[in-house]
Amino acid sequence: MSPSMAFSGVKRASQARLFDPNRRRPLRKAMEEFLIHGVKYSFPPDIGSMTRGIPTAFTSPPLRDHFAYDSEDVYVWPHPKGHERGISFSPLYKSIPEVAMKDEKLYAALGLVDTLRLGRAREIKLAEKLLIDMLKYNA
C-alpha cells in the first residue's frame, strides 16, 4: 500500500469517527462496533470458484481447530503461493494475502474479520470474542 493510500485510509477513518487524528490512535470502541456490526455490510465478500490460495475466515489459524468443516468448506484468498485449495474469497484489499503471509497477528485478525463477513452464527460469535480480545490486548 502506498503512503498516499495509507493517508487516504486514515483520513476516511477519521471522517467515519474510527480514528482520532489528534491522538493518532484508533477509537477502539467505535472500531469494535464497526467490525462486529458493519463490516459484513460495507465489505460483502465475492465468492468464486475453487482455486489455490491462503485459508481465511473460519478455516484460518484462529478458528480452524474450533469447527469441523468439509474440504468443500475451505475459503481461500486466491494467491499463487497459497498452500491450500478452496473456494475463492475476496480479501478486503488486493495486497492482503501477500502481507498476511509476512505477519501472523495481522493474518489472524483478518481471518476473524472474514469470518464476520461470511460465517454462521456460532463462528461469528467466537470470531467476535477473539477479535474483541485482540483489540483490547493491542489497544
Question: What is the predicted function of each stretch?
Answer:
Residues 16, 133-137:
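A short structural micro-motif
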